[in-house]
């Protein structure tokens, strides 16, 4: 017979208030208490919205308006559960109740579904590297990988390989921006020689001279092309559903993108690590060189590479930044968090929604309750 689980911790209102006064952000749902201090700056609605509810019951906020929280958001909340609110016998104002009467009861149909996360009973052993384990999940993999958790991930047994699989955010601009500057300067100088022609490999008579004045246009075109590549890779490669009977394709999916959906706030896995990124960058450079004149290919590539850097920086900020309410990045953050927690089959644009508009994969807007 399995041992009974340990009793939940309990706190009086006075104990909760002391923690709030010390700067913590605790909230409650009925009598259940949650410490969201570490999540405040990640909240898609902004820090202030969450801080304003410190010490309060958030049951109504979970159901909206303005936003009805998804099942995954409610599961996410349970990872921050710390205990129950209990009556303080020395405080006569509580009248023997640990929480106001209207918040004592919770929906019995919902409660079991979003119980406290039990890491010991998960489908994988979180004390061991995950990569080899996920391949054995089979049909359970897709549902499991789209139920995010608030903890870091380890993929490999080897410390060396593990180190190559993650990185800090600032490695991206440090490594790639100097290359963008060098390529831009080098290929601009090549354009100034006035001997670059398009279609010269097919016909000299109808080939087009590429003047230096088109440098900016080619560079911006490269950035625009990157936004399309970003969208296509995210939608069709990262969000492919691997066959449930393919151990290795499941592992490949988890390495490419599944790990990010499982642990969306693992800061060491939010941007593309330099070693695997170098392989992909080299592929795109060689591909462009094969189909275009060297200078044209190089300028397009430099623009695309800068587009990639901006994409990775934007992606990191959407997870860890706290943009001003109403700003472009605020709306993009809300859009991207919905992609993680509720709409995994839409909202594939990270740096822009342009291609979501074009291919009709926008995340549906929630109806304004004031208009109903």
UniProtKB/Swiss-Prot annotation:
<feature type="transmembrane region" description="Helical">
    <location>
        <begin position="268"/>
        <end position="288"/>
    </location>
</feature>
<dbReference type="Pfam" id="PF04116">
    <property type="entry name" value="FA_hydroxylase"/>
</dbReference>
<dbReference type="GO" id="GO:0006679">
    <property type="term" value="P:glucosylceramide biosynthetic process"/>
</dbReference>
<keyword id="KW-0276">Fatty acid metabolism</keyword>
<dbReference type="InterPro" id="IPR014430">
    <property type="entry name" value="Scs7"/>
</dbReference>
<feature type="domain" description="Fatty acid hydroxylase">
    <location>
        <begin position="219"/>
        <end position="361"/>
    </location>
</feature>
<dbReference type="GO" id="GO:1904002">
    <property type="term" value="P:regulation of sebum secreting cell proliferation"/>
</dbReference>
<feature type="binding site">
    <location>
        <position position="315"/>
    </location>
    <ligand>
        <name>Zn(2+) 2</name>
    </ligand>
</feature>
<feature type="binding site">
    <location>
        <position position="336"/>
    </location>
    <ligand>
        <name>Zn(2+) 2</name>
    </ligand>
</feature>
<keyword id="KW-0492">Microsome</keyword>
<feature type="transmembrane region" description="Helical">
    <location>
        <begin position="213"/>
        <end position="233"/>
    </location>
</feature>
<keyword id="KW-0479">Metal-binding</keyword>
<feature type="domain" description="Cytochrome b5 heme-binding">
    <location>
        <begin position="8"/>
        <end position="86"/>
    </location>
</feature>
<dbReference type="GO" id="GO:0006682">
    <property type="term" value="P:galactosylceramide biosynthetic process"/>
</dbReference>
<keyword id="KW-0256">Endoplasmic reticulum</keyword>
<feature type="binding site">
    <location>
        <position position="340"/>
    </location>
    <ligand>
        <name>Zn(2+) 2</name>
    </ligand>
</feature>
<keyword id="KW-0862">Zinc</keyword>
<keyword id="KW-0408">Iron</keyword>
<dbReference type="GO" id="GO:1904697">
    <property type="term" value="P:regulation of acinar cell proliferation"/>
</dbReference>
<comment type="pathway">
    <text>Lipid metabolism; fatty acid metabolism.</text>
</comment>
<dbReference type="Pfam" id="PF00173">
    <property type="entry name" value="Cyt-b5"/>
</dbReference>
<keyword id="KW-0349">Heme</keyword>
<feature type="binding site" description="axial binding residue">
    <location>
        <position position="43"/>
    </location>
    <ligand>
        <name>heme</name>
    </ligand>
</feature>
<keyword id="KW-0472">Membrane</keyword>
<dbReference type="InterPro" id="IPR036400">
    <property type="entry name" value="Cyt_B5-like_heme/steroid_sf"/>
</dbReference>
<dbReference type="GO" id="GO:0006633">
    <property type="term" value="P:fatty acid biosynthetic process"/>
</dbReference>
<comment type="pathway">
    <text>Sphingolipid metabolism; galactosylceramide biosynthesis.</text>
</comment>
<feature type="binding site" description="axial binding residue">
    <location>
        <position position="69"/>
    </location>
    <ligand>
        <name>heme</name>
    </ligand>
</feature>
<comment type="function">
    <text>FA2H is stereospecific for the production of (R)-2-hydroxy fatty acids. Plays an essential role in the synthesis of galactosphingolipids of the myelin sheath. Responsible for the synthesis of sphingolipids and glycosphingolipids involved in the formation of epidermal lamellar bodies critical for skin permeability barrier.</text>
</comment>
<dbReference type="GO" id="GO:0032286">
    <property type="term" value="P:central nervous system myelin maintenance"/>
</dbReference>
<keyword id="KW-0275">Fatty acid biosynthesis</keyword>
<dbReference type="GO" id="GO:0120521">
    <property type="term" value="F:4-hydroxysphinganine ceramide fatty acyl 2-hydroxylase activity"/>
</dbReference>
<feature type="transmembrane region" description="Helical">
    <location>
        <begin position="168"/>
        <end position="188"/>
    </location>
</feature>
<dbReference type="GO" id="GO:0005506">
    <property type="term" value="F:iron ion binding"/>
</dbReference>
<dbReference type="GO" id="GO:0016020">
    <property type="term" value="C:membrane"/>
</dbReference>
<dbReference type="GO" id="GO:0032287">
    <property type="term" value="P:peripheral nervous system myelin maintenance"/>
</dbReference>
<feature type="transmembrane region" description="Helical">
    <location>
        <begin position="290"/>
        <end position="310"/>
    </location>
</feature>
<dbReference type="GO" id="GO:0005783">
    <property type="term" value="C:endoplasmic reticulum"/>
</dbReference>
<feature type="binding site">
    <location>
        <position position="319"/>
    </location>
    <ligand>
        <name>Zn(2+) 2</name>
    </ligand>
</feature>
<feature type="binding site">
    <location>
        <position position="234"/>
    </location>
    <ligand>
        <name>Zn(2+) 1</name>
    </ligand>
</feature>
<keyword id="KW-0444">Lipid biosynthesis</keyword>
<feature type="binding site">
    <location>
        <position position="257"/>
    </location>
    <ligand>
        <name>Zn(2+) 1</name>
    </ligand>
</feature>
């Amino acid at each position: 017979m399995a041992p009974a689980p340990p009793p939940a911790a309990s706190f009086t209102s006075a104990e909760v208030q002391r923690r709030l006064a010390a700067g913590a952000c605790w909230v409650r749902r009925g009598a259940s208490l949650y410490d969201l201090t570490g999540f405040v700056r990640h909240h898609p609605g902004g820090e202030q919205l969450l801080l304003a509810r410190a010490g309060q019951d958030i049951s109504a906020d979970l159901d909206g308006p303005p936003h009805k929280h998804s099942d995954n958001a409610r599961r996410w909340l349970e990872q921050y559960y710390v205990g129950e609110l209990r009556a303080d016998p020395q405080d006569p104002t509580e009248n023997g109740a640990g929480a106001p009467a209207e918040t004592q009861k919770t929906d019995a149909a919902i409660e079991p579904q979003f119980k406290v996360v039990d890491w010991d009973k998960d489908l994988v052993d979180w004390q061991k590297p995950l990569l080899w384990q996920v391949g054995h999940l089979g049909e359970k993999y897709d549902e499991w990988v789209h139920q995010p958790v608030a903890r870091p991930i380890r993929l490999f047994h080897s410390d060396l390989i593990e180190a190559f699989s993650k990185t800090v955010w600032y490695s991206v601009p440090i490594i790639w921006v100097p290359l963008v500057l060098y390529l831009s300067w080098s290929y601009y100088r090549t354009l100034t020689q006035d001997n670059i022609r398009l279609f010269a490999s097919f016909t000299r008579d109808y080939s087009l001279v590429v003047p230096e004045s088109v440098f900016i246009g080619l560079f911006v075109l490269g950035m625009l092309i990157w936004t399309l590549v970003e969208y296509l890779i995210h939608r069709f490669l990262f969000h492919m559903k691997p066959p449930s009977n393919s151990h290795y394709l499941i592992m490949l999916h988890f390495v490419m993108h599944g790990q990010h959906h499982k642990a969306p706030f693992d800061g060491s896995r939010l941007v593309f690590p330099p070693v695997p990124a170098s392989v992909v960058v080299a592929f795109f450079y060689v591909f462009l060189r094969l189909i275009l004149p060297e200078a044209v290919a190089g300028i397009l590539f430099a623009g695309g590479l800068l587009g990639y850097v901006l994409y990775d920086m934007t992606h990191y900020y959407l997870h860890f930044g706290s943009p001003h309410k109403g700003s472009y990045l605020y709306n993009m953050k809300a859009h991207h968090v919905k992609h993680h927690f509720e709409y995994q089959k839409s909202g594939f644009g990270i740096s822009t929604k342009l291609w979501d508009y074009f291919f009709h994969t926008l995340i549906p807007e929630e109806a304004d309750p004031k208009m109903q």
